[in-house]
A protein has these predicted regions:
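Membrane-cytosol interface at the C-terminal ends of specific transmembrane alpha-helices
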Residues: 96-101, 111, 115, 153, ...
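Transmembrane alpha-helices
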Residues: 116, 120, 124, 128, ...
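C-terminal transmembrane helix and the adjacent membrane-cytosol boundary/short C-terminal tail
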Residues: 188-192, 196, 273-319
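Interhelical loop and adjacent transmembrane-helix boundary motif
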Residues: 243-292
Length: 319
């Protein structure tokens, strides 16, 4: 006696509940795109006064004089780039090291708890990081780290000037601490996607543990690691509260990392409520538009790089 195979029948797409469901889901998806377009439109329309007044010169001059309505965003762009790049210099080696340890060398009993605590750092509010930086990091820098750097490397100009603790160096360090969970988490997921037979094949050729990690794992995951780094950069570019509390908030371009600075996000947080003139307000909104577009581009590039490695595959653990 053979079982009769009954073909599955496709539900009618004309039924009212199905149409309502599909319409609701489609609306949810399109609403995100609509919100993105609406944000860009609103920022562009409200920054048009500044754009017509200063043009591209707005991004190439360092004047910031609300009284005389002369505005230039260069100090804020400089502060954003310097603090973010400094954060990457500090955070990338630490993040990759954490990811390699948790995926390749950490005992299985500790792998889960360690990964949890690393990711827990990303859930801490930025204002808490800022408070910690004010009461712990800044005194440490002003009393010990910056005087040492000034004595040994002051001739470079990067570590010269008064050692107050507040400045670009403090902002870069606190940003580095904040982006470590992002970079390490993405890197760990990418490393776990590398097939186990890739590791075994390299070891079978007589490679050491370090050579296996360097050649068999890191080399195959470098695009995804780069994506995680760029994703961390996107977080650093847009970070506001913690940076505002320790960077000094002075619109200047200084060579020394000890000097106070300003970032694009910080100037928006500090001065938006004080902007009384239309041109002043429009200039701040134009800075916000530039920061928004840069962040979108950076994050999109990061997601693309991560996707080239994972190809949509879920991360796989290995023994």
């Amino acid at each position: 006696m053979t079982a009769q195979v009954v073909p599955l029948q496709k539900a009618s797409s004309g039924e009212l509940p199905d149409r309502v469901f599909r319409s609701a889901i489609t609306a949810c998806g399109l609403s995100i795109l609509a919100l993105l377009v609406l944000i860009v439109y609103e920022l562009m329309s409200r920054s048009s006064l500044s754009w017509h007044a200063f043009g591209f010169k707005f991004f190439a001059t360092s004047d910031w004089d609300p009284v005389n309505e002369q505005f230039g965003a260069l100090p804020f762009i400089y502060g954003t780039l310097v603090s973010s790049l400094l954060a990457l210099i500090i955070a990338v080696p630490l993040s990759v090291g954490v990811a390699v340890f948790t995926t390749e060398m950490c005992p299985k009993a500790l792998r889960g708890p360690l990964s949890f605590f690393v990711e827990l750092l990303a859930a801490i509010p930025s204002v808490i990081y800022g408070l910690w930086a004010i009461f712990v990091l800044v005194p440490l820098l002003s009393n010990y780290v910056e005087p040492f750097l000034k004595r040994t490397l002051g001739w470079t100009g990067l570590f010269a000037g008064p050692t107050y603790g507040i400045g670009m160096l403090a902002a870069g360090i606190i940003l580095a601490i904040m982006i470590v969970p992002i970079i390490s988490s993405i890197t760990r997921e990418v490393l776990m996607v590398v097939p186990q037979n890739q590791r075994e094949g390299v070891l079978a050729l007589g490679a050491t543990r370090w050579e296996m990690i360097r050649v068999g794992v890191l080399r195959n995951a470098r695009a995804g690691i780069a994506g995680g780094i760029i994703l961390g950069l996107g977080r650093a570019l847009g970070e506001t509260m913690a940076v505002t509390m320790v960077i000094g908030n002075r619109p200047e371009i200084a060579k020394s990392l000890f000097a106070p600075g300003y970032t694009m996000a910080s100037v928006l947080a500090n001065e938006f409520s004080e902007a009384t003139g239309d041109t002043y307000l429009s200039a701040l909104i134009e800075i916000g538009l530039a920061l928004f577009l840069v962040t979108i581009i950076v994050n999109a590039l990061a997601q693309l790089l991560v996707w080239t490695v994972t190809r949509g595959q879920p991360a796989r653990g290995h023994v």
